[in-house]
């Protein structure tokens, strides 16, 4: 049970991000800025709490507004410019991470900041985002429950609502969707906002778990979430994907990452695994796409 707890905890953070990433990918777009948004969100919460003397709930709300504004700007820039979202959000990644590091150094002289556990509202936020649920005598992080709720909500949205139909149609053919009256631009902007929300959610979990922030804590999370989505069957070209498949992809990553640690293998081998899985997933994805298009 202890081993299951460890890999599910890792999988839950990947999985929450991957739900947002997968929905956006199904709509035919990418967001490479979510990793930097985790660092941005966590540092903004901590700075507002420790340096600005805000309560953690209020600081978290302010951070949420800032984070979804970045997501909105990403989406608006993509739909208005017509440029690939890969390029737009790659630029956003560097802008957000650079600003987060620069502002953190200007205010505190550091890129890591703690002391949030003594702040007002910490116990309340911690109980919501980083407490434990006891099952069969084993304490499981509440983030696992949040992950399950995200999966259920994503599955219902994608498979049982008109919005889900719009997402599939937008990814399959933007032009045809617009001719059918589907609000393609609004769908895409909304999904960019949702991926930003997912990044903020992970940031709150991390801040309340570790009692502080590190500007680099979300580094490479964007790639892990994308790979988890692709492993789960989401097409890189859009128009097809499964939230349950994405959940399995996140579980695979969690098991491998913890397996490497438990085996006493150098953690750098996880980078090798990521690369192998990315190439393999792309190859399988290409084969699956041909069957999907011609089948």
Predicted segments with their positions:
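Inter-helical junctions in multi-pass inner-membrane proteins, predominant
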Residues: 1-6, 100-103, 107, 157-164, ...
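Helix-loop-helix "hairpin" substructures at the membrane interface of multi-pass membrane proteins
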Residues: 55, 59-63, 69-74, 78, ...
């Amino acid at each position: 049970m202890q081993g299951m707890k460890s890999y599910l905890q890792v999988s839950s953070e990947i999985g929450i991000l991957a739900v947002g990433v997968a929905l956006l990918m199904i709509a035919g777009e990418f967001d490479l800025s979510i990793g930097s948004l985790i660092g941005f969100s966590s540092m903004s919460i901590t700075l507002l709490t420790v340096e600005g003397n805000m309560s953690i709930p209020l600081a978290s709300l302010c951070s949420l507004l800032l984070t979804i504004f970045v997501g909105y700007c990403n989406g608006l820039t993509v739909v208005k410019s017509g440029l690939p979202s890969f390029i737009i959000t790659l630029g956003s990644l560097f802008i957000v991470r650079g600003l987060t590091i620069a502002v953190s150094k200007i205010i505190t002289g550091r890129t890591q900041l703690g002391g949030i556990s003594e702040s007002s509202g910490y116990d309340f936020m911690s109980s919501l985002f980083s407490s434990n649920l006891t099952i069969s005598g084993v304490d499981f992080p509440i983030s696992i429950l949040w992950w399950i709720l995200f999966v259920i909500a994503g599955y219902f949205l994608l498979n049982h609502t008109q919005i889900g139909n719009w997402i599939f149609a937008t990814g399959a053919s933007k032009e045809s969707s617009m001719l059918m009256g589907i609000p393609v631009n609004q769908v895409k902007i909304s999904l960019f906002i949702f991926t930003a929300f997912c990044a903020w959610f992970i940031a709150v979990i991390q801040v309340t778990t570790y009692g502080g922030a590190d500007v680099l804590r979300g580094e490479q999370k964007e790639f892990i979430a994308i790979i988890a989505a692709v492993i789960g069957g989401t097409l890189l070209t859009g128009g097809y994907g499964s939230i349950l498949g994405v959940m399995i992809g996140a579980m695979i990553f969690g098991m491998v990452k913890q397996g490497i640690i438990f085996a006493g293998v150098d953690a750098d081998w996880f980078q090798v695994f990521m690369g192998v899985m990315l190439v393999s997933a792309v190859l399988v994805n290409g084969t699956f796409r041909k069957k999907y298009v011609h089948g």
